[in-house]
Amino acid sequence: MEIKTVSIIGLGALGILFGNQLAKRLPKENVRIIADENRVERYKKDGVYCSGERCDFHYVTPEELCEPADLIIFAVKINGLQDAIRSVKNHVGENTVIISALNGITSEAIIGEAYGMDKVLYCVAQGMDAVKVGNKLTYDNMGMLVIGDKEPGVVSEKTKAVAAFFEKYGVPYEVDQNMPKRQWGKFMLNVGVNQTVAVFKSNYNEVQKNGPARDMMIAAMKEVIILSEKEGVNLTEEDLNYWLQVLSTLGPNGKPSMAQDVEARRNSEVDLFSGTVLEFGKKQDVQTPVNLELFDRIRAIESEY
């Protein structure tokens, strides 16, 4: 199989970043940005910018009939996932491959419920330090999309096809043969970094240097390691150090999505991070006091909007 057409839903940081990369290299009609009519009007009127450059996107509404896409990329926030699943319906065909760049460890299963797990590859977006303000995105590091199969040790034809597509069009990627562990690792990083930077109302620099914020972040991450052992994923101290190394590559003035949400007075993905940790803690009878504190503090910030 060869991937020639891609549909992207969600023009947040990731959607703009990777959408722009592909739109500049493929025929315009081969990269479709799915958005409702109001959004399309706004995007066309105000523009969407990536590092100062106006993106030349081809927009389609969910209602428009079209040929199925070879690849669909979900780049929405978790609270927009159900709407997005409905919106891509006309783009899903028999041989469509779906990847989800969402945070957390649940979106693949939710998409798979709607369209079949046989269409879904696992994906982790990591290493980008993009900041989006309004319709303008800036970044120092593009990061990469890590893709692979649900089953450890397997590299399917779908994975090979997506890898070849990314290779051809300059999307930084990696194939991982243990995606469940990679997803839990990224989840661990998000639980630490996203929440701590949001609570301290700061930037990556706050958790890259030694101090109370970094201590809190690592303590929150260590609670995820304990839960991963109970869930059979078995993250280790080595994994913690790998993700701290990823963190050290990010531009110090950049901010994770949750800190950007708090700054813009939007409800955050706290349920996806400490909320999920608290659920797993309850299920496994494991105390997670640091994540409980982060959860309460972020909820308190949101209650003041």
Per-range role (PLM):
Residues 35-37, 61-63, 102, 124, ...:
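Residues at the C-termini of beta-strands that transition into short coil/loop
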Residues 20, 24, 86-90, 113, ...:
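Short, well-ordered alpha-helices that flank and scaffold nucleotide-derived cofactor binding pockets
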Residues 2, 29, 157-160, 167, ...:
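NAD(P)-dependent Rossmann-like dehydrogenase/reductase catalytic/cofactor-binding core
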Residues 52-136:
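Rossmann-like NAD(P)(H) cofactor-binding subdomain of soluble oxidoreductases
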